[in-house]
């Protein structure tokens, strides 16, 4: 029965892809790769258009973008043709794990440092280590006063393993597979065309489960040890965390009256002659143009 249930859940999850193939059969104006048959659908799911990359070859990810005027490899090694194991380790920890995962995790539950993101500065190639064990940049630990969501989430992990270790282990598995395991699988090179926090939403959901469990555990402990009204504690937790986050983050997440993407697409299309062909530099440039052309 368990095997049948697990199989059905896997099929149910993969069934969401059917929407793509159904829409492709309708031949919409924008039809990425046109996955309307088995072969094209297989290529679509495997992302064949993006080429092949190695999950384990970290050295290649360090220097893959070292051609032309791009000198990002200097953040990790003095010589891209002779990379040391120490430099590979520093690249994996400081860039792939810290900058491309832990920083995003901290944004969700600790606090993001302002609207304008800045990349960490390169260390000198002479003398100082290429990459030091620097703290996470772009993170403001005091943004919400105290990072209550993070603290209660940590308490939730402890409380969950103490009360129900089997289910806690299942949540931990979800947290790792949708977080750190994805970091290993993607083997991201530097630079990336955009922030990649959306790739780890599953791990954020898993930690949110522990925030809920931690809140319950905290209420139970306070009620048991101090004979305090649990409803008051629940109300304080319910109000303090989301209200403070909403108050501090509303402006940065409010997209009203921001027309940069609209203006960018409008001006680009207006620069073309009738029936002209416009070459774009990837999807970041293409999507607003599609919106302007097909919707507006």
What are these regions (language model features)?
Residues 6-12, 145-152, 165-185, 237-238:
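Transmembrane alpha-helix segments characteristic
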Residues 7-11, 161, 165, 213-246:
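Signature aromatic-anchored transmembrane alpha helix within multi-pass, membrane-resident enzymes
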Residues 20-42, 251-271:
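Alpha-helical transmembrane signal-anchor/signal-peptide segments
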Residues 24-158:
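Lumenal/periplasmic acceptor-binding loop at the mouth of the active site in multi-pass
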Residues 56-100, 248-296:
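Soluble catalytic regions of membrane-associated enzymes that act on cell-envelope
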Residues 139-142, 164-168, 184-201, 254:
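Membrane-interface catalytic loops of GT-C/OST-like multi-pass glycosylation enzymes that act
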Residues 180, 192-217:
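Hydrophobic/aromatic-rich transmembrane helices and adjacent perimembrane loops
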């Amino acid at each position: 029965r368990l095997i049948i249930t697990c199989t059905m859940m896997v099929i149910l999850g993969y069934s969401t892809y059917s929407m793509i193939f159904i829409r492709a059969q309708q031949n919409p104006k924008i039809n990425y790769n046109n996955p309307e048959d088995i072969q094209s659908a297989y290529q679509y799911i495997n992302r064949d258009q993006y080429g092949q990359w190695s999950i384990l070859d970290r050295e290649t990810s360090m220097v893959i973008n070292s051609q032309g005027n791009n000198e990002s490899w200097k953040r990790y090694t003095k010589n891209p043709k002779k990379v040391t194991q120490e430099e590979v380790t520093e690249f994996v920890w400081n860039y792939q794990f810290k900058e491309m995962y832990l920083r995003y995790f901290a944004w969700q539950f600790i606090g993001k440092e302002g609207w304008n993101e800045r990349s960490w500065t390169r260390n000198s190639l002479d003398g100082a280590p290429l990459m030091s064990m620097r703290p996470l940049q772009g993170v403001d630990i005091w943004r919400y006063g105290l990072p209550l969501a993070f603290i209660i989430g940590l308490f939730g992990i402890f409380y969950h393993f103490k009360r129900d270790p089997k289910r806690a282990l299942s949540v931990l598995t979800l947290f790792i597979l949708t977080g750190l395991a994805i970091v290993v699988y993607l083997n991201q090179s530097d630079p990336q065309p955009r922030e990649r926090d959306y790739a780890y939403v599953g791990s954020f959901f898993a930690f949110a489960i522990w925030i809920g469990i931690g809140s319950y555990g905290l209420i139970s402990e306070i009620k048991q040890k101090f004979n305090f009204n649990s409803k008051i504690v629940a109300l304080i937790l319910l109000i303090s965390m989301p209200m403070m986050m909403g108050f501090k983050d509303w402006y940065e997440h409010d997209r009203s009256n921001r027309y940069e993407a609209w203006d960018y697409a409008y001006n680009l299309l207006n620069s073309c002659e009738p029936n002209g062909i416009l070459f774009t530099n990837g999807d970041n440039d293409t999507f607003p143009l599609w919106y302007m052309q097909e919707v507006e």
